[in-house]
């Protein structure tokens, strides 16, 4: 029997997750509170409330050291706190001045990293904190979608690498145990039920360089992409699947049963 064993959402695109006992899936197919904020380069032409590709933002793909920062987002009070270890770097309301201060603090942090997208591109400054804090919109793809992986696949990847791999590298919303390795990949084009909700599984999730970043140290320390293509014999490096609700959204919970809809 397969069950949900962990749920995550990511208030700020490309930053640390928030572990949850319950997620609310909107009718549109996104998780409430997920990717509601982003840190965008000054020279990115997209409007603040519009979707854009992650290459126009500070994100793990270009700044692996972001993984060291911890995020606490007060969705009701619209307040964001960023910390590094025991040090609070910023604790600001999402008003214009608070956004400016968060952007400045993050720019200072990022510029001190050995690998960063700002030192050679001053035109990307100042950093802009975008998003209203309520609408989930800064996903890898404009369509959003809920993502799910099986821990059986994670264990297979660990065996190929010969070491433990944190599932946080893959930034899924839903982690499931009780599946065989890569079983979830066979769900593409089919429907599953999680608790009381039914989902259509629409595609496998192609991975990027962000998965190489250690979620604790912020170092690129594992060759995830080449392991998936060379040792797992994948044409494209994929891990997890993307899905949308069939019909209306609703809540999913840790402990919910997961099964194919026959």
Protein language model features and the residues they cover:
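Metal-cofactor-dependent catalytic cores
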Residues: 1-262
